[in-house]
UniProtKB/Swiss-Prot annotation:
It comes from the Bacteria. InterPro entries: Integrase-like_N, TACO1_YebC-like_2nd/3rd_dom, TACO1_YebC_N, Transcrip_reg_TACO1-like, Transcrip_reg_TACO1-like_dom3, YebC-like. The lineage of its organism: Bacteria, Bacillati, Bacillota, Bacilli, Bacillales. It comes from Listeria innocua serovar 6a (strain ATCC BAA-680 / CLIP 11262). GO terms for cellular component: cytosol. GO terms for biological process: regulation of DNA-templated transcription. This is Probable transcriptional regulatory protein lin1570. Keywords: Cytoplasm, DNA-binding, Transcription, Transcription regulation. GO terms for molecular function: DNA binding.
Length: 241
């Protein structure tokens, strides 16, 4: 993964995401609600624990998290969401995976299709691009204020069960197998580290650089997808410079 830092890609769109923080919290609340329907105790519900870690890493207020859990525990309205994944291509052959939580599949399918079609992309069949991605645990630790050197941290992370560590001037990026994610996170947390990002995510096996003439359409497609209330995550194999 060297040279293809997910953190760089995150930072590449960070300003736009910061301006939509309330929408990020709204989507996380839906994800917490769905996970909490399997049980309100994160110690007994790994799915809830994962999404709570994700929410805390982006500074979602504890009150918001608690409200979503309480809503699930007291849900008598029949409110329910289905998990749906869409696959396709952005302009220039960039692979795109869209994960959604929806209470109306027809609405979401229509909105996602429009976002692709209006911006030079095309939706594909199930399996058309998912084989290009691997699911991994992902932890980001900001280096500011840390005294640990690169070799020492890498040894700590590997001993905790990490598969790989990437180092840059600003951050340590830690990658794990999905099943080892919680154990690695807990071990590093107990060692005193805090996380700027803590999540299970999808990573491209091969990256694809966006041609300059496709950049505007690509950006518009990403904005349209991320603005959709039903869309939880958008993954691409675009290399963002």
């Amino acid at each position: 993964m060297a040279g293809h830092s997910k953190w760089n890609n995150i930072q590449g769109r960070k300003n736009a995401q910061d301006s939509k923080r309330s929408k990020v919290f709204q989507k996380l609340a839906r994800e917490i609600f769905v996970a909490a329907k399997k049980g309100p105790d994160p110690n007994l519900n790994p799915s809830l624990r994962l999404v709570m870690d994700k929410a805390k890493a982006v500074n979602m207020p504890n009150d918001n998290i608690k409200r979503a859990i309480d809503k699930a525990a007291g849900n008598t309205s029949g409110e329910n969401y289905d998990e749906v994944t869409y696959e396709g291509y952005a302009p220039g052959g960039i692979a795109v995976l869209v994960h959604a939580l929806t209470d109306n599949k027809n609405r979401t399918s229509t909105n996602v299709r429009v976002a692709f079609n209006k911006n030079g992309g095309s939706l594909g069949e199930t399996g058309s691009v998912s084989y290009m991605f691997d699911r991994k645990g992902y932890l980001v630790i900001l280096r500011e204020g840390l005294t640990v050197d690169e070799e020492e941290f890498m040894l700590e992370a590997i001993e905790a069960g990490a598969d790989d560590v990437e180092v840059s001037d600003d951050v340590f990026e830690v990658f794990t197998e999905p099943g080892a994610f919680s154990d690695v996170k807990d071990a590093l947390q107990q060692a005193g580290y805090t996380f700027a990002t803590a999540e299970l995510s999808m990573f491209p096996t091969v990256y694809n650089e966006i041609a300059e003439n496709n950049q505007t359409q690509f950006d518009k497609m990403m904005e349209a997808l991320e603005d959709d209330d039903d869309v939880q995550e958008v993954y691409t194999n675009a290399e963002i410079n």
